[in-house]
């Protein structure tokens, strides 16, 4: 198994575009999109980590009750943002790995791949507040070059490694 670590903290620089603020990783050119192949919307309301999230887009709209994890003083009676991030990252990484296996003629090499992600939430060193660290374990694939190619093609990995444009505005 190859471990690939990704780390994200809030080392952002800001530039103002009209009434919207765009954030990107300091010192790096963020990944910019030349088009939008798919867009999804989500809404969070209530008490933040103890509130509700919903997405009404796509074929299967859904909503979840959020709860503070026991490790952070909560009751752990619901889903938390880190779980959602870990699941999204794992599935996205698997898709990117399988896509790259197909593009490089190694489809069979990723046929039995299983992606395990661990998301750590902790105090961001030197920044205050919280930051994230991610551990990715790739099971069932021996080809390290293929794993690297999957990591480089994964949109989640790209956002964490290179930054993403994040526009924040008043509704």
List PLM regions with ranges:
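Extended beta-strand/beta-hairpin segments
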Residues: 2-87, 94-171
């Amino acid at each position: 198994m190859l471990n690939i670590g990704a780390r994200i903290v809030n080392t952002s620089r800001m530039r103002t575009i009209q009434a919207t603020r765009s954030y990107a990783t300091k010192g790096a050119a963020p990944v910019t999109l030349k088009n939008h192949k798919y867009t999804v919307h989500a809404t969070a309301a209530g008490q933040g980590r103890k509130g509700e999230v919903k997405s009404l887009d796509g074929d299967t709209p859904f909503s979840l009750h959020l709860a503070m994890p026991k490790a952070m003083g909560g009751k752990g009676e619901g889903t938390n943002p880190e779980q959602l991030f870990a699941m999204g990252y794992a599935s996205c990484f698997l898709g990117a790995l399988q896509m790259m296996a197909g593009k490089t003629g190694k489809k069979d090499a990723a046929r039995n791949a299983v992606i395990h992600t661990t998301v750590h939430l902790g105090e961001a060193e030197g920044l205050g507040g919280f930051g994230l660290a991610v551990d990715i374990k790739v099971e069932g694939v021996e080809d390290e070059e293929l794993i690297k190619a999957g990591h480089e093609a994964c949109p989640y990995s790209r956002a964490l490694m290179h930054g993403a444009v994040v526009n924040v505005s008043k509704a």
